[in-house]
Amino acid sequence: MGFKGKYPQMVRETGFKLRQYRDGPLDWRLMGSYETERILREQNFELVDKALTHLSEAPLGTVLETHILDSGIAKYFVMSQYAIQYLMCCRTYLDECVTDLKEAHTTAQEEIATLRKSLSESNNEVVQLHKRITQIEAIREVVYPCHLCTKNFISNEALNVHIGRKHRVASPPSLTSATGKEKDRDKATDVHLINTIKMELEIKQLKERLNAAERNIKERSTGSKRVSPRQEQRHVGIQSNLAEPKEKDEDSGEARQSEASERKEQLTGLAERLSNFEEWQTQLKQSNEQFIQDINKRLEGLSHALEQSKQASASTPPLEDRVATPCLEDLERILTEKVAEIGKVSAHRLEEVVYHLEEGYKEKLGALERELKQLSVQKVQPEPVQTVPVASKIPKPVVRKEETNIDRIRKQVESEFLKQKHDDDTYSIEEAPRKGSEKPFPQLVTQVQVVEKEQPSAGSSDSNPTYTKSPREPAPNKQETKEATDVSDSLSQEETENEEERSLTEEEGTDVPTSGSEAAREDPTPKTIKPSGRIIKSPQKPLTRKDARKMVNRKLMSHGFDMKSKGISHNSLKRVNSELTEHRNKLKLQHPHFYATRNRIRKFVEKLCSAKFSERAEMLLKHKSPLKPMEVPGKGIPRSAISEKSEEDIASSQGEEQTDEQTDSSEQQTRSPSPQRLVSRDFKARLEEILVKPAATIRGASKSSLSSRPVPLPRKRVMFNTTEDGKSFNDSDDNLK
């Protein structure tokens, strides 16, 4: 199109790539809000600018494939989208160029202003300097005026000669006729004075010319049009016996004759002096020419010597054959002296630094020796340290010697049917009053919940079983110490991260105390029961759907999403995804053993869930499947059909009541100081009946409950609730009940 810039090459260098968006819905509401005729009529460029981003990222691929049959029209749409993307990239590039040029323009304007200001200041300084120069020159020119006439003289000697010759009193004629020697002396002094005065005048003229030339050069360089004020030239009057006739009495003839003779002598003297002056000038010219010729010859010799030295350096003779000139020797001597001085100074500084370092190390070593002495004294007199046992957060399946696999399964089934279910299938943990134990230290409780989606299988029912870890028996003759593992670190980190969400949704979990049966199991001798100093907190609030929705909204708001918006844009989704991945990578770096613990927990859960039943239980499960927990009878089913039960269901319900009674009795026995629980012999048969019985009994529902909306089935929850002494939360719930 005739543009000067190569925009395709520039766009390719920036790394821009064309993209075709296929995933995602089209915003038909936004496109419906645009009125093309009105935009054309009003020339609404702002609305078109807003629509550019949506048009460039609209997923046209799937829509064009399904809605437009003509491939040419589809290509027009796709090429228009590519063109929009390309033009948007060019616009961003040009915008950046314009901003850079504006910044450069502003900086250039500022520099021009500063330069103009500095130029005006420099011009003012030049003018002031010219004024000062003129003042100094005027001060340096010392003038000696005559007090008897209007003439001025340069030196005091010239003024005295002028007064002695011009303004002296007339002498008698006998004195005027002096000898020839005196006349010769006067002539010599006059010639000398004239020559000195002329030389001073020439020097002054040359100085004035030099000053004028310097001013012109400065004015041309600065470009200032101001003309420096011209200095007034002062003329010096030369006074001698040869220039003017002496004033004598006109009445005496002798005076006239003497004046005539003097004038003749003055004329002859002046002619001689002029000839001498001309000869002196010619001699000066010749000497100057000879001097200039000598200088030129020397310059030619120097240039010739420089050329020879260059040629000699080009031939690169060995360094040993070269003879150092006096200048080079002086430079080498100066350099060696400087290097020696620098070496001395640096050595002195290094000695000071080393001395300071040695003193610091000596002080640190003395402090370390004192600390080691203190530690050795403390080791000599050790104090008994009370170890506070902390419950391990790693779910490790440990089977007691007295307890078999059947007992563990029995406890799991009992705890399953004794738990209370809420609307959102969460379980609240209540704290029981604490019994007396061997040591009055607080026991920490860990709770690990592994939530998995329910996967239907042939042998499993749709109920939500809760598997608990088998109670763990601590070693009787070993002190319990803190167990810090990678699982505890990772779980503690997760708890600190989700502290705000937990505080808004539910209260902090209370510690579940241990029962006195475990203490009795370790030591059969009765112990004194000490009252616990803990305050019983209110039970935890269950997490409902409303709370979960609030928690999700809060999380989304923290990431910058608006709750009023109906969807999440692709860019914001990418941004949040990148932020979460960065956060996850940071957590991976902080807790490198997190995945190891997760795999360990998974293996433990799979091991628990893959417990095999006996052959009789498997046969019963094959012949009869349990009912669903949320199954509700229809309106057309009569109450007689609902109330009818099979003999096996009645037997199973009776077996459940018996197991409940036995669990209550066993709990009462555990509360008593008896050492062991009573285990029934016919538990195996009763367990098989419990496994075959339905998970929930069918009851008649009211009309309001039947007409209400169906509740979706919750996901399966697997909970590992253990305390330090091996008891589970289910045992503590049984104690409370």
Curated annotation (Swiss-Prot):
Region Disordered, annotated ranges: 167-187, 214-267, 415-548, 624-682, 698-737
Biased composition (Polar residues): 457-469, 665-677
Any Pfam family matching the protein: Dzip-like_N
Keyword tags: Cell projection, Cilium biogenesis/degradation, Coiled coil, Cytoplasm, Cytoskeleton, Metal-binding, Zinc, Zinc-finger
Chain intervals for the UniProt region annotation (Interaction with Rab8): 1-293
PROSITE patterns: ZINC_FINGER_C2H2_1, ZINC_FINGER_C2H2_2
Tissue specificity annotation: In neurons of the second and third antennal segments, expressed at the tip of the dendrites.
Coiled-coil blocks: 98-132
Acidic residues composition bias: residue spans: 492-510
Any single Gene Ontology cellular-component annotation: dendrite
Keyword Iron in annotation: no
One GO-annotated biological process of the protein: cilium assembly
Highest taxon of the lineage: Eukaryota
Residue ranges with Basic and acidic residues bias: 244-266, 415-438, 724-737
Chief location bin: cytoplasm
Family annotation (InterPro entries): DZIP1_N, DZIP_RILPL, Znf_C2H2_type
Main function: Component of the DZIP1-Fam92-Cby complex which promotes ciliogenesis in sensory neurons and spermatocytes by acting downstream of Cep290 to initiate early ciliary membrane formation and thus transition zone (TZ) assembly. During spermatogenesis, also regulates distal elongation of the basal-body and their docking (anchoring) to the plasma membrane and as a consequence, regulates the initiation and proper elongation of axonemal microtubules.
Family in the record: Belongs to the DZIP C2H2-type zinc-finger protein family.
Protein name: Cilium assembly protein DZIP1L
Origin species: Drosophila melanogaster (Fruit fly)
